[in-house]
Structures are given as structure tokens and as C-alpha cells.
């Protein structure tokens, strides 16, 4: 009997001593599991962020129909950018990304970017344009962005050098044609007279929409144009071939085009901020820096807020389609789990150089994640 009591005391002593140790170990193990879970979540989120950046680079090139990023250096951009009013307005009043998250709508737009403005710089002169032993300005080539869209406006911009005294300037735009029997090589497009005062040079725009439309219908008739801006003394003030200190003063075409309006559809989803403690599917902030890529061919924006989706998806949590949960309940082993994906995206406007060194202003669809959900 005494021996039995001793055994009981020993057993109770072991329980008393071992109990706290066991609880302490369980607590420590739980804490380690939680820390490991947080580390795994951070790693997963970082991988998702990196994948999102790479996907954005691929999407931009694909949506702009570019096989590779245009090889245009920062110095080349400075030389090619016209110092002209229309471009300055685009840059100064640039709307980096539209804030329309409040209406819950999502444009049912095409995959590719839609063009709004094209700034075409003079291209290399064709042999047919060799007149009097030297090339004449200017010859413009047009990409499919102009050819397959409706032209709303077309302006030829020319820069007139400053004058020392008040003078009247006669501006004439001529279109090069195939030589006629009488030797005629040019036919008039537009002419105007304007008064200039001493001071800085000025930009002058001329409407060439009709001419451009004819060129698009009959590409073989596009042999180029000649620009003259003579003052009262017969001096040509038009900058056609920029000299020293005249970078960015080339003539150029500003063409505005329009696309078919797109329909809209309604879409709603969870939108969480970066400070949320929610561990499940949500949106996280992500800023894409084009300069960090070395993409100097993008004029604006230099960076934009793209955002990305990350987090866990349970079968009953914010599923995009109600039948997803029912399918899983019917066959839990045979159905894949829902994924955390964007449920609402919006476009960004972009000003960039294409492969032909033309400046394009357009809209790229589905580049900003506004909301995330499980589907």
C-alpha cells in the first residue's frame, strides 16, 4: 500500500513538472509555426510582385505591338522630342492614370492599346525627292496606327526662326509630284501670310487633314512636301534641317485619330489597403518605374501605380462565380482551388516612341489593378 502511494506521488510530481514544460514547448512551437507562416507569406508576396513586374513589361510590348523595346537612348530622346506646343501640352497636362474606381465599371476594351495622337517626324528622303542635288523637306511615313483609324485632325507644325525687325512672312507648303511634261515638280497645298515681330521664333501650324487622307487612300502619291517661309527680303525662316542649337525644331505632323467606342460592364470586388491585417486575397501597392528598366523610349509616365493581387483563397471566400463553391462541394478532390486575381482593372495613358521613332499618345487597357478577388 505504501509502495502504491509512492508511485502515485511520483506520477503526480511528473505531471506537475512536465505539464508546464509541455505547454511551454507547445507555445514555442506555435510561435515558430506562426513566424514560419509569415515568412512564407512574405516570400510568396515578393515572388508575386516580381512576377507582376515582368508580366507588365511583356504586356506593354505586346499591347503596343512591339516585338522588342525600341532602342532609343536618353540622349536620342532629347534630340527627337519636338519643342512644340502640342507635345508640351501632352506632357504638362498629362493624366498618368484615370481614377475611376468609384463607379465600379470595367471597359470591355480590346487587348491592344488604342491610339489617340501620333506625332510623326520626317523620315529619310526618298531618291525621287532629290531635287537640285539635295534632299528637300519633308517626307513622312505612316504606321498602321494612322492607316487603320479614323483621322480627326492633322496639323503640320513648322518652326520659324526669329527676326530682327518687323516683317511679313509668306508661308507656302508644296506637295512633291511626279515630273510633268512641262517639268513641274510641285503643287500647292496651303499658303498663308503672317506678321512677325522681333524676338523669339514661333511655331506655326497648318491644316493638312485633306492631304493626309489622300495619301492614306493613295500611298503612291506620298512623295513628300516642300516648306518655304520667306520674309520680305527673301530669307527662308522655316527650320527644315535643324542646325546647331536647333534640336527639337524639326517640322512634324500631329495626327489625332479615334477608335470605335467600347462598351462597359459592371464589376465589383474587395479593395484593401496595404495596412490591412487581412491575410487572405487582397490588393497590394506596386509602383512600376520605367526608368529603372532603361525604357527611355517611354516619354510619360516615367512611373505609375500598377498594384498586384496576393493572398490565400478559401472556397467560400469572395468567389467570382457562385458555382465554383458548388463544384468543389460536389467533387472536392477533382476541382482546383480558387486563385487570387484582379477583378477590376483600369487603363493608363502613355506617350512613347515606337520603332519608327514616331511619338504616339494612346491608352493601354487593363494595366492598373483596382480590385482583387478569388475565382
Swiss-Prot record:
Query: SMART domains from the entry?
Result: TGFB
Propeptide ranges are 19-266
Q: Which InterPro entries match?
A: Cystine-knot_cytokine, TGF-b_C, TGF-b_propeptide, TGF-beta-rel, TGFb_CS
Taxonomy, superkingdom: Eukaryota
Asked if the keyword Repressor belongs to this entry, the reply reads no
Question: Between which residues do disulfide bridges form?
Answer: 281-340, 309-372, 313-374
The entry sums up its family as follows: Belongs to the TGF-beta family.
Q: What is this protein called?
A: Growth/differentiation factor 8
Gene name of the record: MSTN
